[in-house]
Amino acid sequence: MGLLRTIALVILGFSAFIFTVLFGRLPVFRKTPIGLLHRIIWLHIPHGISYIDARLFNGRILRSWGQAGNYILYENHPLVLIFFTTILVIGELIFIPSAWPRISVMHQLYIPIIIALPYYFLYVSVVTKSYITPDNHAEEMKRYPYDKVIFHPGHSCETCHFLKPARSKHCSYCKRCVSRQDHHCIWLTNCVGLNNYHYFLYLLLSLSVMLTYGSWLGYSLLSQTLDRLIPPSSPVRLRKQSWPTFLNMWAAVVAYDTRIGGVTMLMFMTAPLAFAFLVYHVYLIWAGMTTNESAKWSDWKDDITDGMAFKFIGDHKRSDSPLLESAETADSWPGYSDQILVLTEGDPPKEGHQVHKSSNDVIQPTNPDAPIDRRFARVRSMKEIDNIYDLGFWNNLCHVFGNYAAGKAHRA
């Protein structure tokens, strides 16, 4: 029982840490204990170490940390990728030789394919880049329209020295602007973007399948071990078991069949992580947004909750809002909206207000007695806002996998 508890606690702690690192920064966890733990790990602990070092050691610890620390924390290094690959390789080297003589020919045919696919999709996810360069910048500028809600024209990247295309983001780790940037993945040492997002989804799917299949296969082998140690005809197996008896029985099995038992527990407790990440990205596809965009939409949701968002409901032909000024069009993109959304400090826009060209912020007139602009209504729900990048789940899915036919047909 002690061995089983120790293995379970170690794996559970590792899984919880990985879950927090992967999901803690997502908007849905922003005001939850998971988000708090993520901030503690990445913000409060480093700041606390820096504070203690400055007060007690005059900064000597961080100075000795020096270049190595900066490399680990701020550079696009392969250490996490090496760790991830090493865990996969070691787990398979422990599990497969022990399981191979005990499984049928059918499983012996399945296993090489199931373990090879994650490596292939990991490789193509790592080597496939979605960088925006001077050579493809003009094409990227036309790929997506600016929605004037979360992406505005006229913003330049101070590092790459060109206008930022819609849906792009500059990555401080890759030190490049990335087309349709979803997130920077430390497990890949690469940004997940336009060109490798579908490979990333295949990686998550293949990992989920491998871990689920491995968990089931390991359970089957451990059940065989249980039958050898405690035959089904044994009184212990025949009578109703209490939880302590049940756990002690399986602890004995894991202690006896350590290689299969340890790796099976690791697969069983980490499979939900891969599956949860896959489900989350399916949700993003359904919603027509990326991880980066979900954070921007979350900010809008907070602004709506605070009563700061307003929508133009008047005649667009009579509007002089810069948010209606035309920019470069994306001829290949079917989504379009002429909505005008603005943000205030909470008061409705007043007649004579101005709107920043590069944002939705309102500059109220200097006259405090200016009347309210009745052409604007307060936004009460996210349902009132159009997301031009959401073409419906099927078309979004086709776009992710590079099939633009559905999108073009949708536009026609």
From Swiss-Prot:
Residues 24-78, 129-198, 287-412 are cytoplasmic. It catalyses: L-cysteinyl-[protein] + hexadecanoyl-CoA = S-hexadecanoyl-L-cysteinyl-[protein] + CoA. The chain crosses the membrane at residues 3-23, 79-99, 108-128, 199-219, 266-286. Residues 1-2, 100-107, 220-265 are lumenal. GO terms for cellular component: endoplasmic reticulum; endoplasmic reticulum membrane; Golgi apparatus. GO terms for biological process: protein targeting to membrane. Its EC number is 2.3.1.225. Residues 155-205 form the DHHC domain. Disulfide bonds: none annotated. Keywords: Acyltransferase, Endoplasmic reticulum, Lipoprotein, Membrane, Palmitate, Transferase, Transmembrane, Transmembrane helix. Palmitoyltransferase that targets several endosomal SNAREs. Palmitoylates the SNAREs at cysteine residues close to the cytoplasmic end of their transmembrane domain. May have a role in the cellular quality control of transmembrane domain-containing proteins. Belongs to the DHHC palmitoyltransferase family. SWF1 subfamily. This is Palmitoyltransferase swf1. It comes from Emericella nidulans (strain FGSC A4 / ATCC 38163 / CBS 112.46 / NRRL 194 / M139). The lineage of its organism: Eukaryota, Fungi, Dikarya, Ascomycota, Pezizomycotina. The gene is swf1.
